[in-house]
Amino acid sequence: MAAHHRQNTAGRRKVQVSYVIRDEVEKYNRNGVNALQLDPALNRLFTAGRDSIIRIWSVNQHKQDPYIASMEHHTDWVNDIVLCCNGKTLISASSDTTVKVWNAHKGFCMSTLRTHKDYVKALAYAKDKELVASAGLDRQIFLWDVNTLTALTASNNTVTTSSLSGNKDSIYSLAMNQLGTIIVSGSTEKVLRVWDPRTCAKLMKLKGHTDNVKALLLNRDGTQCLSGSSDGTIRLWSLGQQRCIATYRVHDEGVWALQVNDAFTHVYSGGRDRKIYCTDLRNPDIRVLICEEKAPVLKMELDRSADPPPAIWVATTKSTVNKWTLKGIHNFRASGDYDNDCTNPITPLCTQPDQVIKGGASIIQCHILNDKRHILTKDTNNNVAYWVSVKDAGFSSPDGSDPKLNLGGLLLQALLEYWPRTHVNPMDEEENEVNHVNGEQENRVQKGNGYFQVPPHTPVIFGEAGGRTLFRLLCRDSGGETESMLLNETVPQWVIDITVDKNMPKFNKIPFYLQPHASSGAKTLKKDRLSASDMLQVRKVMEHVYEKIINLDNESQTTSSSNNEKPGEQEKEEDIAVLAEEKIELLCQDQVLDPNMDLRTVKHFIWKSGGDLTLHYRQKST
């Protein structure tokens, strides 16, 4: 992802423009998968994670390619998803601070809720009431009626919400029973807080955990709650008694994910130690190690197509999602106490997953080299790649000087070239009238920057620098009526200046001093402070030295012998550059400069000190 940002003086808000360099279709999860939802009716699995994309997969094992579609609108991690309305609607929560409502069958975003002020970390769903709750790092819990959310339109886009207040710390987990009568939240406060969503009343606070509560589950009638914590324990709570009635020490490290069967008799747990256990809640000595993943477990989803569940889907900090069979899981016996003796380790029920949804690699490190063209990256597969931002065209060097271009401005024009407001009609009014009279009025609209284009599928994101997203769209969609209207409201003035008014920002100037080198024996000049664009190449300074300093000295020495002829008049302008490079050397810190360098490079990589840049010149020895 690349970005440009400026201060928006109108709203006193810093607006950042970002874009994503990617393939048109991103079929693979590119990082850890935070959330899973299974639609057994359509045999579809929804995955969402750290690459901001929600993907739909077929879980039919007979399909060679399980990928179905991607749902893209978020601009940061997707932390949780829930399927509602019998699989027709999907709700998602993201670190971009939004909650989004999706048509799960057609795969498009229907509406965006911007009530939260920080990362939205967890969702909870009451199936019988079609009620969803969202919570996050802003310590707020909001309640949403799903039927109201799905009825929102461009003209009818107002929605009311109830909120549950009282949390003192960031919320990382949330649960609501199917009847919609109880909500429980878990946070870094290390307690469970309980509300009645019907009245928004606080009911109780449950203490017992010693670290962040990362996972919560409620039984159907809301009388019992299971919690998993970074303290490594699973606790069973009686809400009627308002106390913990059982503690299960199954894992060696933090418990981050829980699932439970419909009868609320067996809990499936996973976490930082990469192990997935099934524990009998009625007899905690009866537990089985189902499998061991290759990375910490973030989320699990039971296949509830039968009872007992035949399989469980597991997502980890890696991009691959695995399905593990649960056949034969209830044929095990008590395994003794919970102290996992390393000399007698428990054998996993499964050593290989039953089905694999393969993920892709993601870039985890990058370094831009000094030439600002080449980049080194390292991905999650430990592959190091060497990239170049601009390919050599293979043409010979053109005659004359290179044009001065602002690549950032050209890029902004390319990103918004489909936005009608940026289009320019070069015909003046008189030409328009003549062509109209002659019946020759033609479409001569100029789009883009005239140099290059970006792929139409490129995502463009406007957002507050270091904060929330204001608007996201694909390049090709900026011509749409709705998108154009939103761009008019969102695009900051500094981008308007470049893309609509075609006013490129002025080049930065660098002040410098120009003096003869000590070895030249020339008299030191009056120390005049010069300035030039930081993009100015060293060869241009050499031309200045040759034409304005060396040539003037030669003229004064040869005036009597040359009569009315002057060397400067005899030389063609294009020859000056060649002669300057043949006869002049420019130095900084006693290092001879490459004529292709620009002043910015000289200042940052050779001068390397405070104060104004000082350059020295001398004539090459013949």
Curated annotation (Swiss-Prot):
<dbReference type="GO" id="GO:1905168">
    <property type="term" value="P:positive regulation of double-strand break repair via homologous recombination"/>
</dbReference>
<dbReference type="InterPro" id="IPR036322">
    <property type="entry name" value="WD40_repeat_dom_sf"/>
</dbReference>
<dbReference type="GO" id="GO:0000724">
    <property type="term" value="P:double-strand break repair via homologous recombination"/>
</dbReference>
<dbReference type="GO" id="GO:0035800">
    <property type="term" value="F:deubiquitinase activator activity"/>
</dbReference>
<dbReference type="Pfam" id="PF11816">
    <property type="entry name" value="DUF3337"/>
</dbReference>
<feature type="repeat" description="WD 5">
    <location>
        <begin position="208"/>
        <end position="247"/>
    </location>
</feature>
<keyword id="KW-0597">Phosphoprotein</keyword>
<dbReference type="GO" id="GO:0005764">
    <property type="term" value="C:lysosome"/>
</dbReference>
<keyword id="KW-0833">Ubl conjugation pathway</keyword>
<dbReference type="InterPro" id="IPR051246">
    <property type="entry name" value="WDR48"/>
</dbReference>
<feature type="modified residue" description="Phosphothreonine">
    <location>
        <position position="558"/>
    </location>
</feature>
<keyword id="KW-0853">WD repeat</keyword>
<dbReference type="InterPro" id="IPR020472">
    <property type="entry name" value="G-protein_beta_WD-40_rep"/>
</dbReference>
<feature type="region of interest" description="Disordered">
    <location>
        <begin position="552"/>
        <end position="573"/>
    </location>
</feature>
<dbReference type="InterPro" id="IPR015943">
    <property type="entry name" value="WD40/YVTN_repeat-like_dom_sf"/>
</dbReference>
<feature type="repeat" description="WD 2">
    <location>
        <begin position="73"/>
        <end position="112"/>
    </location>
</feature>
<keyword id="KW-0967">Endosome</keyword>
<dbReference type="InterPro" id="IPR021772">
    <property type="entry name" value="WDR48/Bun107"/>
</dbReference>
<keyword id="KW-0238">DNA-binding</keyword>
<dbReference type="GO" id="GO:0005634">
    <property type="term" value="C:nucleus"/>
</dbReference>
<keyword id="KW-0677">Repeat</keyword>
<dbReference type="InterPro" id="IPR019775">
    <property type="entry name" value="WD40_repeat_CS"/>
</dbReference>
<keyword id="KW-0227">DNA damage</keyword>
<feature type="modified residue" description="Phosphotyrosine">
    <location>
        <position position="28"/>
    </location>
</feature>
<feature type="repeat" description="WD 8">
    <location>
        <begin position="358"/>
        <end position="397"/>
    </location>
</feature>
<feature type="repeat" description="WD 3">
    <location>
        <begin position="115"/>
        <end position="154"/>
    </location>
</feature>
<feature type="modified residue" description="N6-acetyllysine">
    <location>
        <position position="523"/>
    </location>
</feature>
<dbReference type="InterPro" id="IPR001680">
    <property type="entry name" value="WD40_rpt"/>
</dbReference>
<keyword id="KW-0007">Acetylation</keyword>
<comment type="function">
    <text>Regulator of deubiquitinating complexes, which acts as a strong activator of USP1, USP12 and USP46. Enhances the USP1-mediated deubiquitination of FANCD2; USP1 being almost inactive by itself. Activates deubiquitination by increasing the catalytic turnover without increasing the affinity of deubiquitinating enzymes for the substrate. Also activates deubiquitinating activity of complexes containing USP12. Docks at the distal end of the USP12 fingers domain and induces a cascade of structural changes leading to the activation of the enzyme.</text>
</comment>
<keyword id="KW-0539">Nucleus</keyword>
<dbReference type="GO" id="GO:0006974">
    <property type="term" value="P:DNA damage response"/>
</dbReference>
<feature type="repeat" description="WD 4">
    <location>
        <begin position="166"/>
        <end position="205"/>
    </location>
</feature>
<dbReference type="GO" id="GO:0003697">
    <property type="term" value="F:single-stranded DNA binding"/>
</dbReference>
<comment type="similarity">
    <text>Belongs to the WD repeat WDR48 family.</text>
</comment>
<dbReference type="GO" id="GO:0005770">
    <property type="term" value="C:late endosome"/>
</dbReference>
<comment type="subunit">
    <text>Interacts with USP46. Interacts with USP1. Interacts with USP12. Component of the USP12-WDR20-WDR48 deubiquitinating complex. Component of the USP12-DMWD-WDR48 deubiquitinating complex. Interacts with PHLPP1. Interacts with RAD51AP1; the interaction is direct and promotes formation of a trimeric complex with RAD51 via RAD51AP1. Interacts with ATAD5; the interaction regulates USP1-mediated PCNA deubiquitination. Interacts with RAD51; the interaction is enhanced under replication stress.</text>
</comment>
<dbReference type="GO" id="GO:0003677">
    <property type="term" value="F:DNA binding"/>
</dbReference>
<feature type="repeat" description="WD 1">
    <location>
        <begin position="28"/>
        <end position="67"/>
    </location>
</feature>
<feature type="repeat" description="WD 6">
    <location>
        <begin position="250"/>
        <end position="289"/>
    </location>
</feature>
<keyword id="KW-0458">Lysosome</keyword>
<keyword id="KW-0234">DNA repair</keyword>
